[in-house]
């Protein structure tokens, strides 16, 4: 058995079957020769694998989600005296019986879910790394660039788009005393979105923010004239970029996110 060959057959990459076989074989004091046969889509390939397995006195372990392919392999392998073990089929059948739901029978579902998960994590990490203008290099790497003055929901919107839409978002705060990074004028205007808010709304938000920090709401940060100065600066920058501006004064994060997603989909950017 030390030199026993095991053919791992799958209609996808075969990682699931490979891991299960290795886990099972790990319980024995020998290391078999595991050979993966991925992306099997036709009975011709199965017939060939059965023939090779027979000549090598090998075991076949498989994850095939389509019933006809599973049945073909089991039947033909039995005819040739080849042991074939169905790793996932019995479990799919049992779940169908218990739930009364019909399986999708789609190969590679787990891998697609994994890819989506890691894409989300990557987007979240990107949003954190390039939050609040920390690194201007992120502007040119981003799927979306948000610009606006303080307290216009840039950070929560960036996180929402990362979590729910898997978009890499950089956000840049605009302050009259600081020139915007040059990268902001180099990025495609279709990727850039300005977040606008009314002076009165922002005045209220900033006063509440100061109160929550135990500070006086009479600080310059919440002064209406200062706010208007910042908004004028914002208007000047977005006019130069010529990007889309969204009024977030009375919008929930989800609403603003949907506007952005619809805009980029209409432009077929992704």
Curated annotation (Swiss-Prot):
GO terms for molecular function: ADP binding; ATP binding; phosphotransferase activity, phosphate group as acceptor; protein serine/threonine kinase activity. Pfam families: Kinase-PPPase. Its EC number is 2.7.11.32, 2.7.4.27. The keyword Nucleotide-binding applies. It is an enzyme of class 2 (transferase). It comes from the Bacteria. ADP binds at residues 148-155. Keywords: Kinase, Nucleotide-binding, Serine/threonine-protein kinase, Transferase. It catalyses: N(tele)-phospho-L-histidyl/L-threonyl-[pyruvate, phosphate dikinase] + ADP = N(tele)-phospho-L-histidyl/O-phospho-L-threonyl-[pyruvate, phosphate dikinase] + AMP + H(+); N(tele)-phospho-L-histidyl/O-phospho-L-threonyl-[pyruvate, phosphate dikinase] + phosphate + H(+) = N(tele)-phospho-L-histidyl/L-threonyl-[pyruvate, phosphate dikinase] + diphosphate. Bifunctional serine/threonine kinase and phosphorylase involved in the regulation of the pyruvate, phosphate dikinase (PPDK) by catalyzing its phosphorylation/dephosphorylation. PANTHER family: PYRUVATE, PHOSPHATE DIKINASE REGULATORY PROTEIN 1, CHLOROPLASTIC. Belongs to the pyruvate, phosphate/water dikinase regulatory protein family. PDRP subfamily. This is Putative pyruvate, phosphate dikinase regulatory protein. It comes from Bacillus cereus (strain 03BB102).
């Amino acid at each position: 058995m030390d030199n026993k060959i095991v053919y791992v057959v799958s209609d996808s990459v075969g990682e699931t079957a490979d891991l299960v076989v290795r886990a099972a074989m790990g319980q024995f004091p020998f290391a078999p020769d595991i050979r993966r046969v991925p992306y099997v889509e036709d009975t011709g390939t199965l017939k060939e694998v059965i023939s090779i397995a027979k000549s090598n006195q090998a075991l076949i372990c498989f994850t095939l989600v389509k019933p006809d392919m599973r049945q073909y392999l089991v039947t033909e392998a039995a005819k040739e005296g080849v042991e074939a073990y169905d790793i996932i089929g019995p479990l799919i059948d049992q779940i169908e019986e218990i739930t009364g739901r019909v399986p999708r029978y789609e190969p590679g579902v787990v891998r697609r879910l994994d890819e989506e998960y890691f894409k989300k994590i990557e987007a979240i990490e990107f949003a954190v790394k390039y939050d609040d203008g920390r690194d201007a290099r992120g502007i040119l790497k981003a799927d979306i660039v948000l610009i606006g003055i303080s307290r216009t929901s840039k950070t929560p919107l960036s996180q929402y788009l990362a979590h729910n839409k898997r978009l890499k978002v950089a956000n840049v705060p605009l302050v009259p005393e600081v020139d915007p990074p040059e990268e902001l004028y180099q990025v495609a205007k279709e990727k850039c979105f300005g977040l606008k808010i009314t002076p009165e709304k922002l005045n209220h938000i900033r006063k509440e923010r100061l109160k929550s920090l135990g500070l006086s709401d009479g600080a310059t940060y919440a002064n209406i004239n200062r706010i208007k100065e910042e908004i004028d600066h914002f208007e000047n920058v977005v006019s130069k970029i010529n990007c889309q501006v969204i009024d977030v004064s009375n919008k929930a994060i989800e609403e603003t996110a949907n506007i952005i997603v619809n805009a980029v989909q209409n432009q077929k950017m992704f």
